[in-house]
Curated annotation (Swiss-Prot):
Catalyzes the transfer of the enolpyruvyl moiety of phosphoenolpyruvate (PEP) to the 5-hydroxyl of shikimate-3-phosphate (S3P) to produce enolpyruvyl shikimate-3-phosphate and inorganic phosphate. It catalyses: 3-phosphoshikimate + phosphoenolpyruvate = 5-O-(1-carboxyvinyl)-3-phosphoshikimate + phosphate. GO terms for cellular component: cytoplasm. Monomer. This is 3-phosphoshikimate 1-carboxyvinyltransferase. InterPro entries: Enolpyruvate_Tfrase_dom (IPR001986), Enolpyruvate_Tfrase_sf (IPR036968), EPSP_synthase (IPR006264), EPSP_synthase_CS (IPR023193), RNA3'P_cycl/enolpyr_Trfase_a/b (IPR013792). Its EC number is 2.5.1.19. Belongs to the EPSP synthase family. Its main location: cytoplasm. It comes from Streptococcus gordonii (strain Challis / ATCC 35105 / BCRC 15272 / CH1 / DL1 / V288). Pathway: Metabolic intermediate biosynthesis; chorismate biosynthesis; chorismate from D-erythrose 4-phosphate and phosphoenolpyruvate: step 6/7.
Length: 427
């Protein structure tokens, strides 16, 4: 599709769609709890709909009533053996978290995904789950999907130190540990998003967190809850950056999730000198209103424990860095290589084709700014975040056009993205 270019300023207020991570987990916890869980403001992107359909395939009644989703939970012991392969679509979150759920079941199930997901390694979850007594069969030594999981209702507890910072691996192990015969200890490499831990407590579960150590008791029962899903800061990130780099812009985003494990992008914006304000903070839902406006920006360094707090925002942060004076260095982000695409290479290729100066490295990028961007043809390779990054970059292009191939990938997390862009551009 041909993208909007040469924007004269973006102005207005938006409510971004519900948080993808919390939406996934609300369906999983709601299915595993006893009683009817009510979820407000859930994201209706393709990934979350995949999770919803997978639990329906395992016998969970889920009613979508528009603003409200009702999940008739059946407990860990109430799931039914699926009659067909469980299709995770493009969702690595679905596959990894649900693998932990399947680990303790008394049936076998096959998990499949699309072409992109079928290239993503699952050995990071299969190795610890096998240690708990689960039989898992994948493709190649990296356990690429399809994955067949033969559940074990007598799971052994595990003591496991994560070799990488991954909320998905941590969460898979928590879901497995909840079904094990005793207490498990999970030790993080770096602190990652803690939505699973927060929601486990909300649903009446028990765990103890001490720094990077998480202790989870086995054979727990969960109780249905009412969940309000805040807006997704990963989706908000595209408008935050657009508001900073498109001249004559001022954008206000309401009800944005500000869980402390997810707000790394706000730290980066402030370090770069961006004009940003946070107001109307809701301490219960962990949400706030965030306003940004066009700013003079300066390069910075992004590395270490900051990386897990903004891993999904790094593509759009790379664009932000192209519009900052001086050098921006991104390190310790090798996890980007096993996302929907190799995001280090694909981001560099896409933005360099538009005139940026980005050198990909083994674990990140070296970005020189400030650069003028020009027209180009860019392929998403099925990666929603590459698509949205390119659409924001195109707004700065004064000469030439920007063609985006496979733009439909954006529906994975933000079906209304282009409608919201038009709202801001036409004020």
């Amino acid at each position: 599709m041909k993208l909007r270019t040469n924007a004269k300023g973006l102005r207005g207020s938006l409510r971004v769609p519900g948080d993808k991570s919390i939406s996934h987990r609300s369906i999983i916890f709601g299915s595993l709890a006893k009683g009817v869980t009510k979820v407000h403001d859930i994201l209706r992107g393709e990934d979350v709909l995949s999770t919803m359909q997978v639990f329906r395939e395992m016998g969970v009644q889920i009613e979508d009533k528009g603003d409200l989703v009702e999940i008739h939970g059946c407990g860990f012991d109430g799931l039914q053996e699926p009659q067909r392969p469980l299709d995770m679509g493009n969702s690595g979150t679905s596959m990894r978290l649900i693998a932990g759920v399947l680990a303790g079941q008394n049936f076998s199930a096959q998990m499949v995904g699309d072409d992109s997901l079928s290239k993503r390694p699952m050995d990071r979850i299969s190795l610890p789950l096998r240690r708990m007594g689960v039989e898992i069969a994948g493709q190649t030594e990296r356990d690429l999907p399809p994955l067949t999981i033969h559940g074990n209702p007598n799971l052994k507890p595990i003591q496991y130190q994560l070799p990488i910072a991954s909320a998905q691996v941590k969460s898979a192990l928590i879901f497995a540990a909840l079904q094990a015969q005793g207490e498990s200890l999970i030790i993080e490499k770096d602190l990652t998003r803690n939505h699973t831990e927060d929601m486990l407590l909300q649903f009446g579960g028990q765990l103890k967190v001490d720094g990077k150590e998480i202790r989870v008791a086995g054979k727990q029962e969960l109780q249905a809850q009412e969940v309000v899903v805040p807006g997704d800061i990963s989706s908000a990130a595209f408008w935050l950056v657009a508001g900073l780099i498109v001249p004559s812009s001022k954008i206000t985003l309401t009800n944005v999730g500000i869980n402390e494990t997810r707000t790394g992008i706000l730290d980066v914006i402030q370090a770069m000198g961006g004009k940003l304000s946070v107001s109307e903070v809701d301490e219960v839902v962990k949400s706030a209103t965030i306003t940004v406006e066009s700013s003079d920006l300066y390069g910075t360094e992004i590395s270490g424990e900051l990386i897990p707090r903004l891993i999904d925002e790094l593509p759009i942060i790379a664009l932000l860095a192209t519009q900052a004076e001086g050098q921006t260095l991104i390190q310790d982000a090798e996890e980007l290589k096993v996302k929907e695409t190799d995001r280090i290479q694909v981001v560099a290729d896409a933005l360099n084709s538009m005139g940026a100066d980005i050198q990909p490295t083994a674990d990140g990028m070296i970005i020189q700014g400030k650069t003028s961007l020009k027209g180009a043809s860019v392929h998403t390779y099925g990666d929603h975040r590459i698509g949205m990054m390119t659409a924001i970059a195109a707004l700065l292009v004064k000469d030439g056009s920007v063609e985006l191939s496979r733009a439909e990938a954006i529906n994975t997390s933000y079906p209304d993205f282009f409608a919201h862009l038009e709202d801001l551009a036409n004020v």
